[in-house]
Amino acid sequence: MQITRQADYAVRAVLHLARMGTRDRAATSTVAKEQNIPPSFLAKIISQLSIAGLLHTSRGARGGVTLARDPKDISLLEVVEAIDGPIQLNECVGNEGTCAFDESSPIKPVWSDAQEELVSRLKSTNFADMIAQK
């Protein structure tokens, strides 16, 4: 399992906005330039994050992008899943009937535990904590 480049860009964009605070708007061109994100990629990412309720967008001369919630209320998991969908290490975790291993296989609980730990870590990590770490 690998977090996609698009999800990585989304995390960087939200982190950029979190550093600005919830009231300040950022032009998407500024976010793209400062975070080295291709503008066409960023437009799609912002749309997905807006649909997920993580960002507010506004058009026009005074438009831009802002966080929809306080950085402490946005988890890393929410951003990644808004872009990549639910975290799934492999087909043996979460999808009944699609695993090549027998249900009694000793590897299945290892995959399940690893996924639970990853999801838990991403869920417990919020953007306020990340910007505080610098």
Which residues does each predicted region cover?
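N-terminal helix-turn-helix DNA-binding core of bacterial DNA-binding proteins
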Residues: 5, 9-11, 15-37, 56
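Short, hydrophobic-biased segments on the C-terminal half of alpha helices
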Residues: 46-47
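Key DNA-contact positions within bacterial/archaeal DNA-binding proteins
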Residues: 40
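Beta-hairpin "wing" of winged helix-turn-helix
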Residues: 54-68
